[in-house]
Amino acid sequence: SLTGIYNRYGFDELAEQMITKNPEAKFVAVLLDIDDFKFVNDIYGHVYGDNALKSLADSMKAFFPSGALLGRNGGDEFVILLKDYSYDDVKEKLQQFTMAPKTFSYKGKEHQFSISLGYAEYPTFASNRSQLMRCADAALYEIKLHGKNGCMAYKEGLELRARKQLGFAFKDISENLPGAFIIYRADKEDDELFYANQEFLHMTGYKDMDELF
């Protein structure tokens, strides 16, 4: 593979096994991506975008312990699962990794890039892998809203806040679309609703979105 680490499907399968086989263990899931990766591709080209992805994957392999499960979800998003770690164990390390200089090569020169990172703890905030990743994703989304190039631990309420932000975005996008519809994430373990337009609420007899949750 391009990065030499697990793809999304391989990572998800192994992460599921690790958590299922060790229900009493603590885990920390980490989601991270390259800030403004689209601009890296647009300015330097996809070959050099790939160099940035490889560079980040190599940094992850060198920095995190050998027992860490490393994967790439696709695009510029990467994921890590750390077994027998808690927030207190990882806070300083993840901050250090986020702030460490990261570069890729372009025409013989090194160019810097930054990352954003969100993480969540199992079983404190989640009862399964899917929920754990969703919490880490909410923390990553929050750091993106606050200027990128940083890391954040998940805390109660972040997921709802992220969902509301997405709801506002979907409302703007769908304002002129005809018909009744909802937007949700289909998940075999835990479906998640993002948005329902007024036509759908009227058709189903609900007053507002809150009644659907």
Q: Which functions belong to the PLM regions below?
A:
Residues S1-E13, L32-H46, K54:
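Conserved nucleotide-binding and Mg2+-coordinating catalytic segments in signaling enzymes
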Residues R8-K26, A57-P65, Q165-F168:
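Short regulatory alpha-helical coupling segments
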Residues Q17, Y48-G67, E77, L81, ...:
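Active-site-proximal alpha-helical element of nucleotidyl cyclase-like catalytic domains
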Residues H46, K91, Y122-K148:
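Catalytic-core segments of nucleotide cyclases and related cyclic-nucleotide turnover enzymes
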Residues A68-R72:
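A short pre-motif secondary-structure segment
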Residues L81-V90, K107-E110, I115-L132, L158, ...:
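Catalytic strand-loop-helix junctions within cyclic-nucleotide turnover domains
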Residues P123, E142-Q165:
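Flexible, glycine/charge-rich interdomain/linker segments that couple
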Residues F200-L212:
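PAS/PAS-like sensory domain cap-loop motif
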